[in-house]
Amino acid sequence: MSDSINTEPSTDTQTNGERTVETTSPSAETTAGESEEQVRDEWRHYEFDGDTKLSVENLDVWYGDDHALKDVSMEIPENSVTALIGPSGCGKSTYLRCLNRMNDRIKAARIDGSVELEGTEIYDPNANLVELRKRIGMVFQSPNPFPKSIRENISYGPRKHGDINKGLLARLFGRDDTEQEGELVERSLKQAALWEEVSDRLDDNALGLSGGQQQRLCIARCLAVDPEVILMDEPASALDPIATSKIEDLVEELSKDYTVVIVTHNMQQAARISDQTAVFLTGGELVEYDDTDKIFENPESQRVEDYITGKFG
Amino acid sequence: MVMQAYIPLGAEPGGIMPAIIGTVWLVVGATLFAVPLGVGAAVFLTEYAEQGRFTALVEIATNALWSTPSIVFGLFGAAFLIPRLGGDESLLAGMLVLGFMLLPLVLITSRESIKAVPDEYRDASAALGVTQWETIKSVVLPAAMPGVITGVILGVGRIAGETAPLILVLGSTLNATAAVDVIGGFRFVSGPPFIANDALLTASASLPTQVWAVIAAGVSGSPQMGWATAFILLMVVLTFYAVGITARTYFRRKLNYE
């Protein structure tokens, strides 16, 4: 798919997250994000029980001359929540967007490496992007429902994939799926914990919902195409605390049936909802990847400890 | 090309209805020609084409065409279209010439409104595994529709009152008493394109040319008729505006929750 849309590379391309601390204290070297610390492979190696859903090997991404992601390898277990944390500009969103090939839409981006979904290479030249994105859904940072009714937002994906037929032609041929559509809309909205709030106004425009409701609608829209993996790019960063906690509950609920990969700026959020956490630090480097408890209680890397205790970033 | 003497001197105009029908058909035909072409070109230029020298060149050419004097479009019609459309001035030639005049504005405004559709919609749709063309059809174009219609309204306002090119390509039937029967003129034929319409290839009256002929060129004896025709022309244009604004309101309502 060759997109001509000139999407600006995400803010992650700008390395603005690092703050070199100008101080005379002897610990200045270690409190800054850029210490001389060498990343060890065993920090990034995470042993887990259960099946691997996504397997990433030696992934590099360049935006023009900017090396946004450096040699990242990690395996993501099935039916769990994997949090990606790190300061802005560390490449975590870039990494997330590689998992469903959304970076293909950025012209300047060059991607090298391998991403396998259940053993199938997604960067295969013959890979079917439509199938891939049906299996790996995505929820964006700011809620982006279509300017259509709530019902149309949910059924948009299945209709475009031909799973639901509606309209004049379908009616003429007696293959109108209005009933199935109704069931799908109800099921998806219930999964996204939005049904109670909108069941009486499904034909209203989705832009009339609050930000938190819009974001849950986007999650429902993503669930309607029945994905296996859900990628979330800071889904709660534009929302108030109550809406955020609803999204967090939802993520935990979803992890029973789906593999969730979530990028977040909020470390408490990562600690609350995720099973394992990957820490990216400045320069597009994966520094540590382990059980969330291990990362937050006893990280191997000094820089990761500094980051999660708030010394920089 | 057979240039007819424009007005048979001394003849009385055959009423105003043929002119009203002529103008309505001209505008409808021009819109049917220019809108699909203009919107299609805008989609290609904004969504598919590499942004570069080619698109810049098209943009300059479009702007230049939009400010080209209408008589030049008329001459293009007389010299290029008419010989290819049976050799006589005709309603179809008039429609095409007005369509070519409408095309640049439709293209410019469609491009602007397609560019204004937020990329978030395109991202959201792509992330659902929907192809680019389906996204354009179901998300981008509906969101751009009000802007496209605004362009068509502006353009129709210009072409409905256009006189100079019509003098050259529409032909003179000031004294016609019957309006062109476009709908009744369709008939099936045995060879491709299997459909023909003789009414489109006949000359027709139109409101602006009739105003010009009666008031400025001094054809016929009653100037009142010219003023009345001018008034009717205004009404017809306002009716087109009303249709356009209603359509735009409908599409805006669909997009907004207010």
From Swiss-Prot, chain A:
<dbReference type="GO" id="GO:0015415">
    <property type="term" value="F:ATPase-coupled phosphate ion transmembrane transporter activity"/>
</dbReference>
<protein>
    <recommendedName>
        <fullName>Phosphate import ATP-binding protein PstB 2</fullName>
        <ecNumber>7.3.2.1</ecNumber>
    </recommendedName>
</protein>
<dbReference type="InterPro" id="IPR003593">
    <property type="entry name" value="AAA+_ATPase"/>
</dbReference>
<dbReference type="InterPro" id="IPR005670">
    <property type="entry name" value="PstB-like"/>
</dbReference>
<dbReference type="Pfam" id="PF00005">
    <property type="entry name" value="ABC_tran"/>
</dbReference>
<dbReference type="GO" id="GO:0016887">
    <property type="term" value="F:ATP hydrolysis activity"/>
</dbReference>
<keyword id="KW-0067">ATP-binding</keyword>
<keyword id="KW-1003">Cell membrane</keyword>
<dbReference type="InterPro" id="IPR003439">
    <property type="entry name" value="ABC_transporter-like_ATP-bd"/>
</dbReference>
<comment type="subunit">
    <text>The complex is composed of two ATP-binding proteins (PstB), two transmembrane proteins (PstC and PstA) and a solute-binding protein (PstS).</text>
</comment>
<keyword id="KW-0813">Transport</keyword>
<dbReference type="InterPro" id="IPR017871">
    <property type="entry name" value="ABC_transporter-like_CS"/>
</dbReference>
<keyword id="KW-0547">Nucleotide-binding</keyword>
<keyword id="KW-0472">Membrane</keyword>
<feature type="region of interest" description="Disordered">
    <location>
        <begin position="1"/>
        <end position="40"/>
    </location>
</feature>
<keyword id="KW-0592">Phosphate transport</keyword>
<keyword id="KW-1278">Translocase</keyword>
<feature type="compositionally biased region" description="Polar residues">
    <location>
        <begin position="1"/>
        <end position="33"/>
    </location>
</feature>
<dbReference type="GO" id="GO:0005886">
    <property type="term" value="C:plasma membrane"/>
</dbReference>
<dbReference type="InterPro" id="IPR027417">
    <property type="entry name" value="P-loop_NTPase"/>
</dbReference>
<dbReference type="GO" id="GO:0035435">
    <property type="term" value="P:phosphate ion transmembrane transport"/>
</dbReference>
<feature type="domain" description="ABC transporter">
    <location>
        <begin position="54"/>
        <end position="308"/>
    </location>
</feature>
<comment type="similarity">
    <text>Belongs to the ABC transporter superfamily. Phosphate importer (TC 3.A.1.7) family.</text>
</comment>
<comment type="function">
    <text>Part of the ABC transporter complex PstSACB involved in phosphate import. Responsible for energy coupling to the transport system.</text>
</comment>
<feature type="binding site">
    <location>
        <begin position="86"/>
        <end position="93"/>
    </location>
    <ligand>
        <name>ATP</name>
    </ligand>
</feature>
<dbReference type="GO" id="GO:0005524">
    <property type="term" value="F:ATP binding"/>
</dbReference>
